[in-house]
């Protein structure tokens, strides 16, 4: 039985993950963590998530380390915000707890810190900007398509709900990095984030990224390969957060077989090249 701790336990993703874990035969929720000094502290995590009573009380993040030790968690799952997640990963790995992280918006420095903490504490980890199985097939297909369409102009468009805080999305940034890498282009030099005013003629090297926010859009990502007289639009649409949660469950199950001291990706989880 895999013992799982969930941060952001009262959020949309955290609650969904808790509900899904209660439906599995090989894992259980042993800890539920919310923001420091959360007003929900003491509330049963299962009741809060709509999964029925679990006997696991929500605690504030100020008690993270003692909670992980007392619960003997095998894996911590984090879907929160970047600056909080970095601290969570640091503390969890120091406690010898493996991590599955779907939080987005990490800076290069924050991601480097995550990688260092996983390595220094020799724990197992899966960190991905998008846990959806379909999106990771999307990334894998982009990797194969891009060299073939290397002479096309490339634009990335993403759309999310009006509560999303970071832009462009982590998924759009991953797609951008996959494309730039396949074309041997420096992301720092070729990324163009929206356009306004007299920006001049589009260069052949640039890759555009555009963010739309509105309503309850779960997550749409389109990569346009635009040539003279034709274009290819490659799109992934998430209709429900359940697609991300299904990927989280796969990632949790992968952890026991993962290599220690390195950060695995969803490619590793899914066995993609």
From Swiss-Prot:
NAD(+) binds at residues 8-13, 34, 102-104, 128-131. GO terms for biological process: diaminopimelate biosynthetic process; lysine biosynthetic process via diaminopimelate. It is found in: Cytoplasm. (S)-2,3,4,5-tetrahydrodipicolinate binds at residues 161, 170-171. Its EC number is 1.17.1.8. It catalyses: (S)-2,3,4,5-tetrahydrodipicolinate + NAD(+) + H2O = (2S,4S)-4-hydroxy-2,3,4,5-tetrahydrodipicolinate + NADH + H(+); (S)-2,3,4,5-tetrahydrodipicolinate + NADP(+) + H2O = (2S,4S)-4-hydroxy-2,3,4,5-tetrahydrodipicolinate + NADPH + H(+). One of its GO terms (molecular function) is NAD binding. The keyword Cytoplasm applies. It is an enzyme of class 1 (oxidoreductase). The active site is at residues 160, 164. GO terms for cellular component: cytoplasm. Pathway: Amino-acid biosynthesis; L-lysine biosynthesis via DAP pathway; (S)-tetrahydrodipicolinate from L-aspartate: step 4/4. Keywords: Amino-acid biosynthesis, Cytoplasm, Diaminopimelate biosynthesis, Lysine biosynthesis, NAD, NADP, Oxidoreductase. NCBIfam families: dapB (TIGR00036). Belongs to the DapB family. PANTHER family: 4-HYDROXY-TETRAHYDRODIPICOLINATE REDUCTASE 1, CHLOROPLASTIC-RELATED (PTHR20836:SF0), DIHYDRODIPICOLINATE REDUCTASE (PTHR20836). Catalyzes the conversion of 4-hydroxy-tetrahydrodipicolinate (HTPA) to tetrahydrodipicolinate. This is 4-hydroxy-tetrahydrodipicolinate reductase. The gene is dapB.
């Amino acid at each position: 039985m895999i013992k799982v701790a969930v941060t952001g336990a009262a959020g949309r993703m955290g609650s969904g993950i808790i509900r899904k874990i209660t439906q599995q035969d090989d894992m259980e929720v042993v800890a539920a963590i919310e923001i420091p000094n959360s007003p929900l502290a003491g509330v049963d995590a299962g009741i809060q998530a709509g999964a029925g009573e679990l006997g696991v009380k929500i605690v504030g993040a100020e008690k993270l380390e003692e909670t992980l030790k007392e619960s003997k968690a095998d894996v911590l799952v984090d879907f929160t915000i970047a600056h909080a997640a970095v601290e969570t990963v640091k503390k969890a790995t120091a406690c010898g707890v493996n991590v599955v992280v779907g939080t987005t918006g990490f800076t290069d420095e924050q991601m480097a810190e995550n990688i260092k903490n996983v390595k220094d504490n020799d724990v197992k980890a899966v960190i991905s900007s998008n846990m959806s199985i379909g999106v990771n097939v999307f990334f894998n297909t982009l990797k194969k398509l891009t060299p073939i369409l290397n002479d096309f102009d490339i634009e990335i468009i993403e759309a999310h709900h009006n509560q999303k805080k970071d832009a462009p999305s982590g998924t759009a940034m991953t797609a951008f990095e996959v494309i730039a890498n396949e074309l041997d282009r420096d992301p720092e030099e070729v990324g163009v984030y929206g356009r306004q005013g007299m920006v001049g003629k589009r260069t052949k090297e640039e890759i555009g990224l555009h963010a739309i926010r509105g309503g309850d859009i779960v997550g749409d990502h389109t990569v346009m390969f635009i040539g003279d007289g034709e274009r290819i639009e490659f799109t992934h649409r998430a209709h429900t957060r359940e697609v991300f949660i299904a990927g989280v469950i796969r990632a949790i199950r992968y952890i026991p077989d993962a290599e220690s001291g390195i950060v695995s990706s969803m490619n590793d989880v899914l066995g993609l090249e």
